[in-house]
């Protein structure tokens, strides 16, 4: 239950509600409590707390004497509030005094007499030996207290589904093993990081068309070494299609090409780009704040961080690595950046700020350009260079 996982992690990590009894009291006042039985809600809450503890989002910090005292006091207050007065109401007493008006006791309902059964006395049950044993957890003590881990706090502040946070951290740990040389089979590429983010429940996958399956299967098998995780819902084709579409975007394929190749229109592409941009940002933050991953290999940790940052910027701007320095200039998108790179060979704001009059003239002669636009971009590049000093 991703929603309940996120909400309980949030109230433990940020709301100061950090014991089992307080969590129950908080949830009992929510709309969810009106939609299910209290016992069911308590069981689901225990399951969620167990999952969060087992997956490194929160820690159990022991039973609190203060919480036990508070629970005892609250039980006394609740008992006083539930002291029912089961006496006859005043209106009934008044009505009974009216001549000719009697209170008639409710008669027992008559049941239809059934004929003797013809089948067995008991049916529809399985023998106990036929059931498969299932893992069960003891209920959390009411006085148990919890504290968020660094991972849990970060996941909560990033508004991630805790399952997404767990998938990302596991994938990053695998990537660290590859980059550090501990794993000599796998490889890390831009597609690896895109696919890791797309495997989370926070990503919205794309439905593959019939003619998409060959390309998707080819990618699944051809990039097998690069995959850092498996999809949360085992729908590999849908999530790989989302990965490949965004990969085409950051390889500078046009919107028309992406629509023709994948049947994905601009609005759907934009929504997936924004989701992956957010998830890659979250991935970068989780990696930077996870000291256990940094201790594996500081050099590999830095390399992986820089790789995620590069892919994040490529997804944001929809471009290849060589023009990342140009798209960061105000007013320069990926199309203009590519034209500047192909025409003049510039690659950074510093190069643009040093353009000669001849370079400016060549650029302004291109279709869609003008001397005024070129001067404006040179001014923006110069300001960017001054700010970076």
Q: What are the residue ranges of the model-derived segments?
A:
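Accessory alpha-helical DNA-binding modules that contact the DNA backbone or grooves
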Residues: 299, 308-389
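C-terminal helical "lid" subdomain and adjoining coupling/linker elements of P-loop NTPases
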Residues: 37, 63-66
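Alpha-helix C-terminal capping/helix-coil junction sites
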Residues: 53-54, 341
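Long C-terminal interaction/binding lobes of large macromolecular proteins
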Residues: 28, 285, 336-338
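Short beta-strand "wing" residues that participate in macromolecule-binding interfaces
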Residues: 60
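C-terminal helical accessory/scaffold domains
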Residues: 46-48, 54, 78-334
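C-terminal helicase lobe
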Residues: 1-50, 57, 96
């Amino acid at each position: 239950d991703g929603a309940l996982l996120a909400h309980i992690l949030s109230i433990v990590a940020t709301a100061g509600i950090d014991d089992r009894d307080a969590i129950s009291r908080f949830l009992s006042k929510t709309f969810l409590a009106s939609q299910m039985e209290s016992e069911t809600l308590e069981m689901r809450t225990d399951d969620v707390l167990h999952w969060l503890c087992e997956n490194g989002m929160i820690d159990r910090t022991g039973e609190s004497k203060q919480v036990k005292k508070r629970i005892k006091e609250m039980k006394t207050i609740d008992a006083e509030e539930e002291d029912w007065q089961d006496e006859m109401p005043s209106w009934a007493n008044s009505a009974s005094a009216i001549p000719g008006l009697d209170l008639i006791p409710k008669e027992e309902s008559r049941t239809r007499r059934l004929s003797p059964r013809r089948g067995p006395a008991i049916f529809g049950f399985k023998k106990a030996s036929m059931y498969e044993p299932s893992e069960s957890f003891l209920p959390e003590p009411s006085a148990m207290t919890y504290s968020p881990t660094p991972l849990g706090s970060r996941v909560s502040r990033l508004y991630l589904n805790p399952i997404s946070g767990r998938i990302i951290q596991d994938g990053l740990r695998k990537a660290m093993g590859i980059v550090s040389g501990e794993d000599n089979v796998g490889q890390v590429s831009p597609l690896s990081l895109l696919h890791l983010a797309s495997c989370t429940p926070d990503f919205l996958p794309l439905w593959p068309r019939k003619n998409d399956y060959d390309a998707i299967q080819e990618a699944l098998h051809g990039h097998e070494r690069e995959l850092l995780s498996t999809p949360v819902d085992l729908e590999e084709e849908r999530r790989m299609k989302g990965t490949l579409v965004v990969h085409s975007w950051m390889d500078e394929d046009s919107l028309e090409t992406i629509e023709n190749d994948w049947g994905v229109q601009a609005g759907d592409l934009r929504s997936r780009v924004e989701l992956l941009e957010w998830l890659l940002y979250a991935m970068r933050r989780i990696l930077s704040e996870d000291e256990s991953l940094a201790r594996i290999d500081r050099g590999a940790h830095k390399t992986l961080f820089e790789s995620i940052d590069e892919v994040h910027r490529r997804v944001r701007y929809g471009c290849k690595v060589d023009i990342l320095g140009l798209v960061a200039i105000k007013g320069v998108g990926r199309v203009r950046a590519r034209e500047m790179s192909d025409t003049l060979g510039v690659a950074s704001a510093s190069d643009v700020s040093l353009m000669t009059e001849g370079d400016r003239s060549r650029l302004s002669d291109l279709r869609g350009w003008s001397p005024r636009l070129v001067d404006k971009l040179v001014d923006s590049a110069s300001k960017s260079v001054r700010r970076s000093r």
